[in-house]
Each structure stands twice: as C-alpha cells, then as structure tokens.
Amino acid sequence: MSAPESSISPVPPPGSSSGGGKKLDSLPKEDLVKFAKKQVAHVAEMKKNQTALMEKLKAKMSELEQVKKDAENLKLINEKLTTESAKKVENNPTECTECLSKSGALIELEKEVFEWKEKATRADMISLELRDLESKVDQLNRALRDKTEALIKAQEVITENDLEVNNMKKEKNNTKSSIEKLTEENTRLTKALQDEKIKSADFEARLRSAECRIVELSDQQGNEKLGLARKMAESENRGRILEEAVDVLKSENEKLLAKNEEFSAKLVSSEKEFAEFKKKSHFVLEKKGKQEDETRKAIEKLEKSKVTITELEQQADQTRQEHFKTVEDLASSRDKAERLEKTLKVLKSELTESEKAHTTAIDELQSSSSKLIQRLDEELRLMRSSRDTAEQKIKDIEIAKEKVDHLLQNERQRSENENGSLKSKLSSATKQIHSLEKELQELRNDFETRRIQSNQHQQQKAIAAVVPQPIQLPEHPIPPLHYQRPAVAPSDSVSCYDEPTQPDRSLEDVLYGDLGDEYRVESDELSEEKFKVILDQLENLKKTNHHVAELLSDAETANGRLTTQNSLLKDEIRRLEREEKREAELSNEKNMEYLKNVFVQFLKPESVPAERDQLVIVLQRVLHLSPKEVEILKAASAHMATAQAGSWSSYFSGWSGAAT
C-alpha cells in the first residue's frame, strides 16, 4: 500500500487551475514543451499505478466473495448438525455418548466458525480500506482530469510548436549539419569546461600560495618592526651614553677652567718671578728633553682619543646605514604588497573571464537542443555550486585583502612615524657628536695651553731655585714708617724691599715637586683608567639595553596575544547573550507566529524597499542579530529590490500556494 501512495503527486488546490493557465500562457515555448513532457510522463506513471491498484482491488474482491460463500456454507452445515443432534437426543436419549462424541466435533466447528468470523471482520476491514482506495482513486481521477485539461492545452501548444517546427524545417533544410556542428561545439565546450576546471584548480593553488606569501610578508614585517625597535633602543642608548660622556666632559672642562683660573693667577706671579730670574735658564735646557718626552706621551694619548672618536663616528655611520637598510626593506615589502595586489587583480579578471565563458557556454548549450540541455542540467548545477564556492572564496580573499591593506596602512604609518623619530634622533645624535667634537677640540686646545703654561711655570721655578740673583742693598737709608714709596715702572728691577720673597727651595723640590705642591697635575694613568671604566660602563649599558629590548618584544607579543584572546572572548560572550535572548524570544508561540508573518511579508515581491528595511529592524529586535547579519539582510533586501521577477521566482516557487 505504501509504494503506490508515495508515487502519487499531491492534489493541487481548487483555485490553482486558473492561476496555472495564466502561468502556462506566460511561459515561453521551450518551458511549455518541457512542462508538457513532464506531465505526459507523470500521467503515464499515474496510469500504471491505477492499473496496478485496480488489479489489486479485483483480486481482493474475489477473495472476499469466496470468504463470504465459505461462511454461508459453514453456517448452513452448523444449523443442520444442531437440528440433527437435537432430534437424535429427543428420539434416543441413550445415544448421548454419540452426542458427546459429536459435541467435540461441534466445538471444533464452532472454533472454525469463530475463525471464519474473524476472517469476515478482516474482510470488512479490507472493504473499508478498499473504500479508502476508491476515494483516493476518485481523487486521482480528479487530478487526472485536471492534468488531462493541462495536457490538452499543452498538446495544443505542442501542435502549434509542431507547425512552427515544420515551417522551420521547410525553411531550413541544413539543420542536421548545424546540429552536428553544435554537437562538435558541445564536445569542444565540455573540453573547455574541463580545462576551465583545471584552471580554477590552478587559481585556487595560486590563491593559496598568495595567502601564504601574505602571511610570510606579515611575519617579515613583524620581524622588521622588532629589528627597528631594537635599533631604536640601541640608538637611544648610544645617545644617552654620548650625553653622559658630554656631561662628564663638561664637568671636567669646568674643573679645568677652574684650574686654569688658578694657573692664570699663579702665572701672573710667575711672570713677575720670571722677570727677576731671566738669566737663570741653563738647567731648563737640560730638562727640555724630558718634557718633550712627556709631550710626546700626551700627543699619543690624544691620538688614542681621536681613534676612539673615529670609532664612535663609524658606529654612527653604521647606525645610519642600518636605518637606510631598514628603509630599503620597507620599500621592498611595499613593492611585494603591490605585486600581490596586482596578482589578485589578475586573478579576479581571470575569474570574471571564466564566469563570462561559463555563461556563454551555458547559452550555447541551451540553444543547441533540449536533449543536451537535459544532460547538461546536472553539470550546470555543479558549475553553479563551484561558481558560488569560488565567489565565496573571492569574497573571503577580498576581506583578507582589505584586512591586509588595513594592516599595511597601519604598518606604513607606524614605519613612517618610526622613521621620522629615527631621523630626528639621528639628527640630534649628529648634533651631539658635532658638539662633542667641538668640545674635544676646545679641551685639546686648553690642554695644550695648560701644558705650555705649566712648562713655563716649572722652568721659571727651576731658574729661580738654581740661579739666585745677588741682593742689592739700597744706597739711601731706611725710610721711616710714614714714608711713601714712589711708583716704580714694571720694567725696572724689583728689590727685596719691594715685595715679600718666598723662602728658598732646593733643586730636588723644584725638579720633582713636593707632595703638597699646588702645581702638580693629574697623571695620565688615572685618565686612562677612567676611560677604561667608561668603556666598560658603555658595554654593560649596551647589554642591558639589548636585554630590555628583547623583554619589550616578548611583552608586546604577549600583549597582542592577550588582546586577540580578549576580543575573541568578548565576541563569544556577546554571541551567547544573543542566543539566550533569542531563545527567550522564540519560546513564546505568539512570537513565532509573528516572526513567520514577518518573513512572509519580507519575501513578498510586492513589498516596498522601505517596508523591507523596517522588517529588518523588527527581525534584528526579535532574533537579536549581530551587526554583520543585519548588513547581510539589508544587502538581501536591496538585491530583492533591484532584481528581476524572473530571477527570484525560481527560488520562491513554492511560496505562491502557501501565501494563499
């Protein structure tokens, strides 16, 4: 019973015949031919099912008649046996034993009668089923009548089409050759379709490789950022170190200036002494050799300092070269990104060309013949599905491209900002280096002048200690206390009475100096030790700077990971909240009915775009949609407003009967 019922098509509603006639009138000829062929096949299936059902009905009716006849015969036999047994008991009461023996047979007969009654009830059930089948057959007959009417119309259309076909045959006798050409073209198109499938696979592989390249470029850019950050930190540390060195040099310069002032004050006194002891300069010539050796040592130390300055300048040049290298790397990364964009554009153009080729092939196949169309329907469906998947992939690629473009723009802005900061820092570093060079030159000049002054002072001391002048006593008597001394010119010789003389010093004190001597200068060994200490401090600062930069990069990566996890968790929480609200809204049956009406109103072709926009707001409130889903609904409403009626009728063909 279930097999024929499943093959029966649903009965159309009573008001669908007029609407069906209008639809048939509006359909084109090719669609009418297809519809008529489908209806003929459906009617043939219905006839086959009807003949099988009629045969089954006849067989079951014959079985029922036999069962009824057997039941009537059994009833007659039972009545005869009961009457005979009653007569025998009345006539011969001694023959009860025989009656008892026959009562067993009667009981068996009663059982058989009960079984036959059950069979009769079953036959009644079968008769009810037969009535149901008859009602279904009536419904099928009605459906057949409707379909025969549609077939008559279709046959009329077919006759018209046959007439037109005959006319076309009379006009065109070379259709066979064209059909052969079309078959050849179809074979060629199938080959082209296979080639295009291969090309689409190649395009997918290229797209995957492009995605891998984009990922590699993003990794390279991240590594370049880390390198730039490290170089920035190193340049900052170098600037700080240079600033500290400048501060140290400034402090030393201030000390030297203070000493210079002291030396200048002492030089004034030494010049006065030198005027007194000009003639006592013999031992100075012997000590000039030693002093020249000391000056040579000082010059060598100055050359060492010059070498250190050149090394610092080389380091600054290296930093500049590294900066230029980073700028070139950024330019190369930009070129690579532009190349990727060009490849994506080429892929898009190729995809559009392939879609155009598909559409042209589909049009040619549809115009070729109905048989080829039926064969190629499945292939077209597959191609459409592949095209949809390709479009979805293209959309995903476009979204990824937009993301990559956004990231590239951000990275370009960051790189530009970093380059600007690097340029400013480099300019400041160069300025500091120039200022340091100037200060070093000034310090060298001051050092040389102080050396000369100290040498002259020591020479004067040596002359004063070794060759003392004879003391000239005044010819006139000692003046009284209130006597004023006349002014003496500076060129005149000064006597012992004019100024207080210093105590006499030995030659060893003058040559080697005393421990408490004010004119003693710091040794060069101490300055070298200070320079080594400063270099060690610089190396330690570089190491700490490198370590801090690595810690900063690790912290930045961890921070980025935490931000992504935080955003994902927030999105998941929002989605769960929307799901809970949606379940609370849809738990009520009234809301479900309201939502069904909203969907039906949204899908009606008669609705205005403004109404659809309002319905989108209602759906957003009831279903608690996300912003992306709202945008999708708005895009669908806009597409429904701009699309043709024929393009949407295929998607919503089953809604016409439901809406009524």
Curated annotation (Swiss-Prot):
Domain GRIP: 585-636
Alphabetical list of InterPro entries matching this protein: GCC2_Rab_bind, Golgi-autophagy_related, GRIP_dom
Organism of this sequence: Caenorhabditis elegans
UniProt GO cellular component terms: Golgi apparatus
Location of the region described as Disordered in the Swiss-Prot/TrEMBL record: 1-28
Coiled-coil annotated spans: 30-92, 115-464, 517-596
Protein name: GRIP and coiled-coil domain-containing protein 2
PANTHER family: GRIP AND COILED-COIL DOMAIN-CONTAINING PROTEIN 1 (PTHR23157), GRIP AND COILED-COIL DOMAIN-CONTAINING PROTEIN 2 (PTHR23157:SF26)
Domain of life: Eukaryota
Listed Pfam families: GRIP (PF01465), Rab_bind (PF16704)
Keywords tagged on the record: Coiled coil
